[in-house]
Amino acid sequence: MMLSKVVLLALLLSLSCLWVAKASEQRTRVSEVVREAEIHDGGQCTDDDICNKNCLDCIARQCIFQQCVCSKRFFPPNSQPNLRVKKH
């Protein structure tokens, strides 16, 4: 009985370690994408349509905190991320 509890505890511990490692890997990917984003010189916006008109050289663009944020990096169509501004 005690052995089965120890085995179950070890199994749960190993699964939680795998889950933490997977979450950490995803966080690294997101931070790489955020580093690729830049605030466009075009300036302020009220919605994404304004950024689409002003940031023609960008591949992905969004209006965040009333600033056009764009990425010149190519993302496959199914994995295009939501862009965020990283505070320094």
UniProtKB/Swiss-Prot annotation:
GO cellular component: extracellular region
Superkingdom in the source lineage: Eukaryota
Statement: the UniProt record of this protein carries the keyword Signal: yes
Keywords of the record: Antimicrobial, Disulfide bond, Fungicide, Plant defense, Secreted, Signal
GO BP annotation list: defense response to fungus; killing of cells of another organism
Principal location class: secreted
Signal peptide: 1-23
Protein location: Secreted
Disulfide bonds: 45-63, 51-68, 55-70
Keyword Secreted: yes
Family named by the database record: Belongs to the DEFL family.
Name recorded for this polypeptide: Defensin-like protein 267
